[in-house]
Curated annotation (Swiss-Prot):
Record-listed E.C. numbers: 3.2.1.18
Organism of origin: Influenza A virus (strain A/Chicken/Scotland/1959 H5N1)
Cofactor: Ca(2+)
UniProt protein name: Neuraminidase
Additional facts recorded: The influenza A genome consist of 8 RNA segments. Genetic variation of hemagglutinin and/or neuraminidase genes results in the emergence of new influenza strains. The mechanism of variation can be the result of point mutations or the result of genetic reassortment between segments of two different strains.
Region (Hypervariable stalk region) residue spans: 36-90
Virion surface side: 28-469
Assembly and interaction partners: Homotetramer.
Changes after translation: N-glycosylated.
One GO biological process term: carbohydrate metabolic process
Length: 469
């Protein structure tokens, strides 16, 4: 083949390759156009997903449904008008307590990222129940958990997570900087109360839907403190009790009426020889009932009830089935403070039913261990120690701690009454165990008028952790 023939042959091959490449490009363009035409045609056939979520936006609860159209999510919204929780129903009749939640936070925290906490409590809106807790700005099994037995520090914050979940950085919502706190929902928004600052001048910061709305300054300059459980709401108003003054003597106690995060009224209790701390409050038939801790001189629990105008009555639970810890053995009760083993105490609760009372208490008379619920049919007004029902919650060989009440409004349950519930803190670590930290998990129960069972639902974590060795 001479040189001219070689050139002609190579040129012909290049031309053929170029033509093939051009044909392929034209085919690619045609296929893209056809694919786009098919996709555009499918827009007339939207696929409706069954997923429905609840979100909070612009102070209005919004029901959102996602419609999947060509891989693009559009949101259709139907606003649900917010309605204030009435709070005027009576407590539901109950025969026992059904297990509601258990977070297993300490067990999971041995290998997972779980907050070091104490003072957990539960509060419910008309849509959900959340666990609130005071963190120590530290995780379990980490060096910053050292020394977290301390109650008040600038690192403590109020946070919340869905009920039954272990409190972690991944599921928790910041609420307030606080070493003492309360929270509740009025049917429209969340009210949070967080107390922080020095012992001689602490300030309570009130937030409504996450926005600061008011503050309350310590009026006795002696460790302003509040409930460590939910406040109580009815007809658009929420109510809380605060204490300022000695933990082992006469202190000052105030009831606050709060609307949309603003204090609209307060009254100081005229309660000589009474001691109120860490009250557990709930609405019942249009009034608020609070059962509290006497850290001064009572092994039975003081109570205060009041209406929306803050007109109040005070007393002590009369039953000889004593509810505090430490306490004497059950015996002769009193409608005033029972002084035997009356010093110190632990946060607790009771539910009043006419002349009767459900009493929650530790099983041990001297340490924060075990837990039980007792029904005393005459215990609110009579001083004997007889009772008719005892339900085991935590065995005496396992640690317990604080306990408190919460309620589920009819707007949440669909019942025509207020469902009584309670939570129990299960404290682990210092000062009773050989660790560098103090934390806790929690369990909760709700009252039912059907079958229940007594058992033990302990924390269950095996200590010490790696950080403790």
């Amino acid at each position: 083949m001479n040189p001219n023939q070689k050139i002609i042959t190579i040129g012909s091959i290049c031309m053929i390759v170029g033509i093939i490449s051009l044909i392929l490009q034209i085919g690619n363009i045609i296929s893209i156009w056809v694919s786009h035409s098919i996709q555009t045609g499918n827009q007339n056939q939207p696929e409706i997903c069954n997923q429905s979520i609840i979100t909070y936006e612009n102070n209005t609860w919004v029901n959102q449904t996602y419609v999947n159209i060509s891989n693009t999510n559009f949101v259709t919204e139907q606003a649900l008008a917010p309605v204030a929780l009435a709070g005027n129903s009576s407590l539901c009749p109950i025969s026992g307590w059904a297990i509601y939640s258990k977070d297993n936070g300490i067990r999971i925290g041995s290998k997972g990222d779980v907050f070091v906490i104490r003072e957990p409590f539960i509060s419910c809106s008309h849509l959900e129940c959340r666990t609130f807790f005071l963190t120590q700005g530290a995780l379990l099994n980490d060096k910053h958990s050292n020394g977290t037995v301390k109650d008040r520090s600038p690192y403590r914050t109020l946070m919340s997570c869905p009920i039954g979940e272990s409190p972690s950085p991944y599921n928790s919502r910041f609420e307030s900087v606080a070493w003492s706190a309360s929270a509740c929902h009025d049917g429209i928004g969340w009210l949070t109360i967080g107390i922080s600052g020095p012992d001689n001048g602490a300030v309570a910061v009130l937030k409504y839907n996450g926005i600061i709305t008011d503050t309350i300054k310590s009026w006795r300059n002696n460790i302003l403190r509040t409930q460590e459980s939910e406040c109580a709401c009815m007809n658009g108003s929420c109510f809380t009790i605060m204490t300022d003054g000695p933990s082992n003597g006469q202190a000052s106690y105030k009831i606050f009426k709060i609307e949309k995060g603003k204090v609209v009224k307060s009254v100081e209790l005229n309660a000589p020889n009474y001691h109120y701390e860490e009250c557990s409050c709930y609405p019942d038939a249009g009034e608020i009932m609070c059962v509290c801790r006497d850290n001064w001189h009572g092994s039975n629990r003081p109570w205060v009830s009041f209406n929306q105008n803050l007109e109040y009555q005070i007393g002590y639970i009369c039953s000889g089935v004593f509810g505090d810890n430490p306490r004497p053995n059950d015996g002769a009760g009193s409608c005033g403070p029972v002084s035997s083993n009356g010093a110190y105490g632990v946060k607790g609760f009771s539910f009043k039913y006419g002349k009767g009372v459900w009493i929650g208490r530790t099983k041990s008379t001297s340490s924060r261990s075990g837990f039980e619920m007792i029904w005393d049919p005459n215990g609110w007004t009579e001083t004997d120690s007889s009772f008719s029902v005892k339900q085991d919650i935590v065995a005496i060989t396992d640690w317990s701690g604080y306990s408190g009440s919460f309620v589920q409004h009819p707007e949440l349950t669909g019942l025509d009454c207020m469902r009584p519930c309670f939570w129990v803190e299960l404290i682990r670590g210092r000062p009773k165990e050989n660790t560098i930290w103090t934390s806790g998990s929690s369990i909760s129960f709700c009252g039912v008028n059907s079958d229940t069972v007594g058992w033990s639902w302990p924390d269950g974590a095996e200590l010490p952790f790696t950080i403790d060795k």
